[in-house]
């Protein structure tokens, strides 16, 4: 009788451990990388924009220190540039060439790396020519920045 109880208890623990092992990897698989979270923010910017063309990530500032909790809002700073793709095409911005003399916007705010939670708090302001002592020249998909920085 004692052996049956021990066996039943062991079976329950084994089942719990198996379920835990199945749940933990799927939770971590839902976390985005810092860059993916920023690209999601750019997509949201394009969805909410009333401008004619899509914007694409031009420059991503350094990510913050590593934080194990994907649900914690992380500060973010990045630059986007107008592309040649019209917004209604719904083409991925990464496949669009930058528009010559297109608008450039500096964006700051917070993102989370959790795919389930989706709080984004991003504000973008248009930049005029020089940013932080640097001037960037962009041709199609490539940009060269000169100056300090």
Swiss-Prot record:
Signal peptide: 1-29
Superkingdom assignment: Eukaryota
GO molecular function: lipopolysaccharide binding
Disulfide-linked positions: 85-96, 107-124, 136-145, 138-143
Compartments reported by the entry: Secreted
Keywords: Amidation, Antibiotic, Antimicrobial, Disulfide bond, Secreted, Signal
Homology family: Belongs to the cathelicidin family.
UniProt-recorded name of the protein: Protegrin-1
Organism: Sus scrofa (Pig)
